[in-house]
């Protein structure tokens, strides 16, 4: 997470402040999000604070037990006296303690939207992104990570989807035998000014896991 603070810093030092668990979801104010028709979900809210920059970062994790889904989003709050320019704020980050995965991305065109491409992960970074102002079938904001032996019926698989129709960014990086996944708004040319007392919320990312195939 990167921001330009009034103290001339390009990073923030967010430290844990509080956490809260509730049985109802605090919905997004400006963007669409996931929901359960029966209202069965739990929410974990983690508040991080940067004392120097007088800003806060609220991380929301919503658990949908019936469908094995966790959603993740972030809300940035400016409680200082000067505006803050956000240049990067991802919706989710997930670290896996393995590196032997196969990345699946999806692309296509009208009437043939979901063509699957696969890449066996090695050391380095793999990016699925859009710069066009839309998501569309040309660069779908949904990715999957499975093991090399994963099939339709066996093996583990992670699925990540960003609920956002604008320019998006999904990156998977492998280093030192570990895998890091991030997903969110496209950071290239992104700059959003958050005024005093204002907030900025990211799109919601949907994460799911299966131990029995795709």
Report residues per predicted region:
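Conserved structural scaffold segments of CAZyme catalytic domains across common CAZy folds
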Residues: 9-214
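Short, small-residue-biased leader/transition segments that mark boundaries at the very start
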Residues: 2-5
